[in-house]
Amino acid sequence: MQELISCEGAMCAALVDSSNGMILGQIGSGVDLEVAAAGNTEVVRAKMKTMRALGISDIIEDILITLGKQYHIIRPMARKEGLFIYLVLDKAKSNLALARRKAQEVEKDLMV
């Protein structure tokens, strides 16, 4: 998790269990991560349900939510089904492409 927060513009990050919305690890501040984890669990579930309904048999690499002042990246873990990385970035200070790449690298290296 420390590696995620080192990303330029990163405010906070969490590892979330999408089966129950619980945070398994977190770092940083600026967002109520308990509330965000629960809400983003619903986002992940809704997208997966929609993909099944559409017959799409692919994986979600990441989900990007763009706000006026922030980026929120949700990255389901390919190697550990049911978990996702949640990263919040200050839009004015971050590089979205580099942050997405960092989330991908952390996902590959993260031991759960």
Give the label of every model feature segment.
Residues 1-13, 18-112:
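Non-catalytic interaction/Regulatory regions outside core domains
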